[in-house]
Curated annotation (Swiss-Prot):
Function of the protein: Component of the cleavage and polyadenylation factor (CPF) complex, which plays a key role in polyadenylation-dependent pre-mRNA 3'-end formation and cooperates with cleavage factors including the CFIA complex and NAB4/CFIB.
Keywords: mRNA processing, Nucleus
UniProt keyword Secreted present: no
Subcellular compartments: Nucleus
Domain of life of the native organism: Eukaryota
Description of how the protein assembles with itself and partners: Component of the cleavage and polyadenylation factor (CPF) complex, which is composed of cft1, cft2, ysh1, pta1, swd2, pfs2, dis2, yth1, ssu72, and fip1.
Chief location: nucleus
Keyword match Electron transport: no
PANTHER family documented for this protein: SYMPLEKIN, SYMPLEKIN-RELATED
Lineage, top ranks: Eukaryota, Fungi, Dikarya, Ascomycota, Taphrinomycotina
Protein name: mRNA cleavage and polyadenylation specificity factor complex subunit pta1
Pfam families: SYMPK_PTA1_N (PF11935)
Species of the source: Schizosaccharomyces pombe (strain 972 / ATCC 24843) (Fission yeast)
Family stated for the protein in its record: To yeast PTA1.
Amino acid sequence: MEVSETDEHLTRLNQARDIVKTDQSLFPEIVRNILSVANYSDIRYKKWMANFLWFGFSSKNVKFEQKLDLAVTCLDTIVSLYAVDNEEVKKDVISCSCTIYPLVFLHCCTSPNDSSTWDTLTKLKNEIINDFDKGNKPLLISCIKFISCVILTQVPGIRDPRLVTKSDVSLSKVPTHHPFINSNILRIEANDLIEKIFSILFSDSLNVLYITSVLNILPVLVKRRKELAPKIIGSLLEFHLPNPKDEIELSNESKLAIRCIEKNLKLILLHLAKSTGASSSSVEKIHAYLSGQIYHTKVDESLKKRQYEGNISAASKRVKSSAVQSLVERMQPQLSSHDGLQNNPLISIFASQTAINPLANFDVTSIPVEVATEIVLTSLLKIDKNYFHQQINMLRERVRSLSEPESLGLDQQVDEDEDEDYEPPEVDVQTINASVEREAARLEGSAPSNVVTDAFELPTPDSLSPMAILEYFHGALSRLFDYAPQFERSIVSSSNLQNLTLENVDNTVWDKRHWAILLPRLCTRGLLNYQPVTSGEESGDASFTLSSFVRGQLFTYVASNWRSSTNLILNWLSEEWYNDRLMLENPDCHEYEDVKWEGPQYEKWALKVIDSILPYLEAKDKVFMIFMSELPELTDAIVDKIKFVCLDPDKTKLGFMTFQYLIMFRLTCT
């Protein structure tokens, strides 16, 4: 084509791309019509086509099914574009292949007769991996991303069909007896690819860009393929940055690169420690790795700020007096020159070894935690109590002196060139005396005698009125039942109903099963079942208790959807029945002065629940039959309710089936 004709053609292609940007759903139709553009000899067509394919397949607005069909159609074109000797074209093709590979892989899994497509896909994969092995630097980052997509595809994913999404393509999609896809070979290849990307971390050259690219894909691999977590975490823990102190001629740029990689590595390890795929042993190893620091050499201060090049005048600052300097030296004993002591500010407070002490150069982190714990406990049992308290007081005073430095008010050397009008600050004699006394007490190993701590007491809260208590209680119960629709289905599963008690409730998890225990207990034993009786009251009809309020709220909830709350109703009525039996068998427990028992509650609320159920019964409602058989007691009034069901022409069969069921499986029923 002539130059003018090529430019005109590219202009029309750009217009087509603008249309796709406006409405990305048109991408499949347009790309099929212009796919032959990639065969033109002009390199500008190939660049445009590679970029357009990458743009279209990376769009989230194109449906997955359309991408799946289009990926197979464009596969040959993508392979031909990757053969072009142009870095820009290859980068776009590799980026496009990150989306193409899992799509074509899924097509091959569901099409056992299309082996030619699988061969073409394998050819594309091998060519990209070969460029990675050659160390083609302009393409290396794109190759790392593509290899991560291949690993995700060739490793088994989530097998539960309820959790997996259709866009998550993994080795689990491959049928057991596939004619040309061997799952074992692909899985071994995925493990080899993991070793390939980790080879960048362990290479001799320190390239921040490539190492960061590898580190950034690792959390994605662990999140989507949890079985890779042990291998990835283990390889990361074997990675150690070079020590800048060992490389005397290390440039500032290399030192900054090490700091950048160290920061990124720490973030990645912390993220992996919080991920669900990491085991407890892996988490412990990660924390031990981080606590030991990646390298123990402090980076030069020249990397943080530029040094002042001018001459520093002696008159620009005041020099500390010898008395102040000697006091600081006594309060901060000389530390070892070990790198760990210099880098860790906490060690500078707690450690008191001198530089010549051999313990200063001993790495405590090399001792296992169990052995260190046993040593500490044994030492604490055998140490002299007075000496122990003396050291504690010294440590307490050292921490206080470092965290709250006080002005000692000692003489300071004033430069001769200082302004004659300068007036020194007033000396606080009390502050000096307190500081001197604390220093003397520290040296004697005893705490200061005049340290007075003011006792602090919280004010007694005002007592709430009965109406205020009722209002707050109503608000708490209302918030609880606002979340009731989230419970869904059964509040308590039948398998856990017998063994679920307040004693074996796990405090770390508070869910619908625990509310099923708490609410019935609030009605019966959790809240007071007694109502204060005034001298003018003769009956309890006008009285109102908190337990009756909970019963009303609970009844309103279960009546709205009784089928999904059957177990909760049975649990509640069983608690009411048990409480009534205890109260009736022990009449002395409710004969206290100024209190009155509300009376039996089981039959009252059981009848209310049954009345709310009856209008919603069906002709063959087996849930009702099982519910009646599980009631703790069948009173005459409850049996009359079943008789009422027998009199209903639409539910006669249900009523007699219920009686038959009770006679067969509930022998005590009359």
